[in-house]
Amino acid sequence: MATPCIQNAFRRKTLPVRIGDLFVGSEHSIKIQSMTTTATTDVDGTVRQICALQEWGCDIVRVTVQGLREVHACEHIKDRLIQQNISIPLVADIHFFPQAAIHVVDCVDKVRINPGNYVDKRNMFTGKIYSDEQYAHSLEHLMNKFSPLVEKCKRLGKAMRIGVNHGSLSERVTQRYGNTIEGMVYSALEYAEVCVAMDYHDVIFSMKSSNPKVMVAAYRSLAYELDQREWSYPLHLGVTEAGSGTAGIVKSAVGIGTLLSEGLGDTIRCSLTGSPINEIPICIDLLKQTTELSERWGEADNPFAIHSSKQLGTRNTLNTPPWGNVYGLLINLTDVQLLTAEPIELLQCLGIDTTTGKIDPTTPEGVVVPKAMRSSPIVSEIEKHLLVFNKEDAPILNPMNEEEWLSEETLSAPFVYFEVTDIHTARRFFSLRQHSTQPVCLSFSLDPHLSKNEAIIDLSARLGALLLDGLGSCVLLDFVDIKLSRTLGFLILQSANIRSVTVEYVSCPGCGRTLFDLLAVSQRIRERTKHLPGGLKIAVMGCIVNGPGEMADADFGYVGSKPGMIDLYVKHKCVKSCIPIENAEEELVQLLKEHGVWKEPE
């Protein structure tokens, strides 16, 4: 048996950045951070939440600072933390108000700014065109406005995060580069150039998006551009506005897990709607599940190069009628499951209504069964609704045997199963077979000893990393819990922008700017709209500071505009404003009807 040359990743080397009493960077452990949801002016409540976050394992905490009232509150919060011997670094989140950053840096350990709104106006889609002269003048204006903060941070030894958000790029950047990954990267680099020119290097970067595919591509591109310039600054990873529940965990794990597996990332946050405390165990599990990969890190040329399907092999679907040319989901059924399960219960677990024969949108395309069970009554019943494959009809490739990957017997099969044990071996497999057009079914099994969240994170990180690069033709999941298998399978396919079979929800985690009960409203909107067809994306955002920008690719948006009032958006355009919150959900339904996407629940 041949020993494979596994495509290892090493952790990207970075400068150490000091934030309060801790250091961030490649020579230090990956840090977990979160953000308070209390009003920053509620000093008692904010301090209590910060203390709770630290107890749960949070390393860095951020608070929103909208103006001078919040600046003064931060002074009291920091004093209270010092009095209670709480050393967790305090970070101020700044949007639209540079003076708040200048003042608050005196009492916090780090400031976070958004290049899309710190100096320039956020893009309002006016169609304004910047000449080269106007663009150069804007860069000079940026230098003049941003340099006082850089100078003060440098003088006081305070850190800064330059946090770019997809969808909230400035008008100037959007006009030149579009709302693109390139625009995100150059937005960050413009601010980086000011820091470098002023010899200030306590800087961390983030490139967030609610779309994991955009987020991963943006971080890879920024890491490449920074290292081309020998600017080895740390990265903070996050999928912004990931949402709630299992879907939010999947999105975060697909994006963050992919980058961690490539050696990128020095701090992480899972932005889940609800209490920030709920984010911490997910982050802990995510780091735990990527530990095996980190133990494999060794030398490699450029592990975070911008991957593409052209580099690693093309994706060929099985194209089996009535499947068609889609990326399919298969569920493995063992002989034990087929022999012991109640037929009706098994069909229901697969998403088949045994009374009406109706198929759920998250029903897999097919099942894989042992050949000996093919003629059993239960398999015959399944075959009335789904495709059935004999497991023995295609080779199951050993991830540890490279010779088998390229053997004549393997390459002559109509398709193959490849068991994915780790991301780097799978990438090695596709790299060696990059000229092959043979469909590959990615096969995944889960350790039954994992908790539910650990299982979700493990599968999302392993499968998501490959799907984001367009690898494989279909997925075969082999879990005891069949219903969880199909739910996770489609959520991961949706997070990787491969397929969309259900409504996707974008919702922010909440912060001190949030104007309504975000979790409750999100859940109500989900319940009212979850029956709508796949491909639809609805955003629920707590305020207008980040809301309109961070829901960049949502079809419809529900955004808090002021206390008790909601604005409704179609794409990036506000179409109904200042709706009383008690009427807003019904108005959203009416808006969906006006645009022809509403249908009544059955």
UniProtKB/Swiss-Prot annotation:
It catalyses: (2E)-4-hydroxy-3-methylbut-2-enyl diphosphate + oxidized [flavodoxin] + H2O + 2 H(+) = 2-C-methyl-D-erythritol 2,4-cyclic diphosphate + reduced [flavodoxin]. Binds 1 [4Fe-4S] cluster. One of its GO terms (biological process) is terpenoid biosynthetic process. One of its GO terms (molecular function) is 4-hydroxy-3-methylbut-2-en-1-yl diphosphate synthase activity (ferredoxin). It is an enzyme of class 1 (oxidoreductase). Its EC number is 1.17.7.3. Disulfide bonds: none annotated. [4Fe-4S] cluster binds at C508, C511, C543, E550. The keyword Transmembrane does not apply. InterPro entries: Dihydropteroate_synth-like_sf, IspG_atypical, IspG_bac-typ, NO2/SO3_Rdtase_4Fe4S_sf. Keywords: 4Fe-4S, Iron, Iron-sulfur, Isoprene biosynthesis, Metal-binding, Oxidoreductase. Belongs to the IspG family. Converts 2C-methyl-D-erythritol 2,4-cyclodiphosphate (ME-2,4cPP) into 1-hydroxy-2-methyl-2-(E)-butenyl 4-diphosphate. This is 4-hydroxy-3-methylbut-2-en-1-yl diphosphate synthase (flavodoxin). The lineage of its organism: Bacteria, Pseudomonadati, Chlamydiota, Chlamydiia, Chlamydiales.
